[in-house]
């Protein structure tokens, strides 16, 4: 009886290797999408800052603000994939990085719905850039799912980092980090 369970378990573990008949058909888009937000400092800084700022707002903002970002970014991604242009996208992205850094640095408190709109505007441009950079031959649905998942990871990282800001030293570090993000956004604007 024991032999049968071991054999069955080993056979079951081997089955997934048989199921690779469609390698790359869907994974390429998903992996490219997962990678894209991590390929640019502007995206990393903005998305971590969104999570951080949402955490400082507290309450329902911790999940509403990042969720608004992800939802609107998906729409922006679709616009980019469809080739629908937005004005001054790169400038807007640099401005969003600077603005989000300032929101973190000064621990700006605004109502959650307003914060969701603010990050939604930022997300539209970030999503648009992700969409227009869809790699050739990639699965668009997988690509969008990938960059949305990566965004959630970066938001969670920001929320986690914000949890370290307690005490005077933590608050100073948070303000300096927010200022550094704002300066990075300004640097993106000029160069």
From Swiss-Prot:
Disulfide bonds: none
Protein's membrane topology: Multi-pass membrane protein
Record field: transmembrane: 38-58, 61-81, 84-104, 114-134, 144-164, 170-190
Key word Ubl conjugation present: no
Major location category of this protein: membrane
Annotated keywords: Cell inner membrane, Cell membrane, Membrane, Signal, Transmembrane, Transmembrane helix
Subcellular location: Cell inner membrane
CC per GO annotation: plasma membrane
Organism superkingdom: Bacteria
Signal peptide segment: 1-21
Keyword Signal part of the UniProt annotation: yes
Pfam families per UniProt: HupE_UreJ
Task of the protein: Needed for full hydrogenase activity.
Record protein name field: Protein HupE
Organism expressing this protein natively: Rhizobium leguminosarum bv. viciae
Gene that this sequence comes from: hupE
